[in-house]
Amino acid sequence: MKVTNAEYMASAYLSSQFPSEMYPEISFIGRSNVGKSSLINTLINRKNLAYTSKQPGKTRTINFFLINKSLYFVDLPGYGFAKVSKTMQKDWEQLVNAYLSQRNTLKLSILIIDGRHGPKDADIDMFDYLLDFERPVLLVATKMDKVKANKRKQRITEMRSALELDQDDELITFSSATGEGKNELWQIIEDLL
């Protein structure tokens, strides 16, 4: 898809702040600092539309970005960051649950995993949780440019095994630095719209 327009639309601390359901939505979810915002920025050919930070836990709201005035990219707060209060973690969980359970226009949830390290227990739990909603889930392994070429096949096999993926289940390898996986990811998104 050629992105001709991408704009920030809203940040929601509460489900009542979600924009109206006018367009199909693609959600992006993953642990803190796995590269969610960088992935979004790479897909839309912008450097700073989705805020990136080296400090984990910066995305504390659900952020909606309107793409080509026809599609929302939805950046969900990162999970698994221990340096926030239990109350804040619970608030994030409730907000994300409200989003995932209420949005009729949600077409795909993209679960982002750090390809350098593979899935952590929290990633496996999130994958199972997303599957409970009976909507499409796509796995994307980011930062693959940092995995040595002679270790990539082994890393992908390990990720597929840890997540108990079937042969037909897709796992996209992605790099914001090189653009690897960008076209493949866009093709999957376009096929769902």
From Swiss-Prot:
GO term, biological process aspect, one: division septum assembly
Which parts of the sequence bind GTP? 30-37, 57-61, 75-78, 142-145, 174-176
Domain EngB-type G: residue ranges: 22-193
Cofactor(s) listed: Mg(2+)
The UniProt record gives the binding positions of Mg(2+) as: S37, T59
Annotated Gene Ontology MF terms? GTP binding; metal ion binding
Q: Which UniProt keywords apply?
A: Cell cycle, Cell division, GTP-binding, Magnesium, Metal-binding, Nucleotide-binding, Septation
Is Transferase given among the entry's keywords?
no
What does this protein's UniProt record list under function? Necessary for normal cell division and for the maintenance of normal septation.
What protein family is recorded? Belongs to the TRAFAC class TrmE-Era-EngA-EngB-Septin-like GTPase superfamily. EngB GTPase family.
* Name of this protein: Probable GTP-binding protein EngB
Q: Which organism is it from?
A: Natranaerobius thermophilus (strain ATCC BAA-1301 / DSM 18059 / JW/NM-WN-LF)
